[in-house]
């Protein structure tokens, strides 16, 4: 297994290098939250681009203090260049204008604000924006359109969350990051498990079977239940996949009009 993950690391590093070169970039930038996914992407980018891989730390007014601490520790451990931009003043303006905004609206605003900072830095420094969303999030649509889902290339987009965790172990990501509950850190008390209703250790095996059995076909709940999955779990996950499938297909562009 150790050998397989070393091959995976080499493969993902090669992907980053070739795709950046293909687009004419020598530098990359990504958002570093202090969470697992961005830590893995950060270390991979550091392996390939060295000082030309730059992390942006963008805490909001509700970000947990340990998120910033963990991000800074990672930068120190792996000699990652970084810049901190607090988005707290901007989310404060949003909150003052939209006092009745839901937590989802507030979270989406912060996610899109972070992406605006990333793309502004990208233009300023001639850097390519690297994504940090994993396959579990992408299949479930668990992300913000034009926010954390936006990027030029993504090295971990085909890795399920549990696979990203295993990869992180082989990249020597600090245990504090490995052991904390997954969270987008978009509002106080938020966690992936609370939002999704299940831990990734339960969700990922189901997602893998859905991908293997129903690629380009309607998902059949009965077949999955026969494999031993809980019926409520199956129903909830299928509902999320179907509801958010459009996020993987955007933008939908009208075909060229051809008058007869």
From Swiss-Prot:
EC number: 6.3.1.5
Entry superkingdom: Bacteria
Catalytic activity of the protein: deamido-NAD(+) + NH4(+) + ATP = AMP + diphosphate + NAD(+) + H(+)
GO cellular component, one term: cytoplasm
One Pfam family linked to the record: NAD_synthase
Gene3D superfamilies, alphabetized: HUPs
Binding site for Mg(2+): 37, 137
Positions annotated to bind ATP: 31-38, 132, 161, 183
Associated pathway: Cofactor biosynthesis; NAD(+) biosynthesis; NAD(+) from deamido-NAD(+) (ammonia route): step 1/1
Binding positions (deamido-NAD(+)): 112
Protein family (similarity comment): Belongs to the NAD synthetase family.
Function description: Catalyzes the ATP-dependent amidation of deamido-NAD to form NAD. Uses ammonia as a nitrogen source.
The protein's name: NH(3)-dependent NAD(+) synthetase
Gene (UniProt): nadE
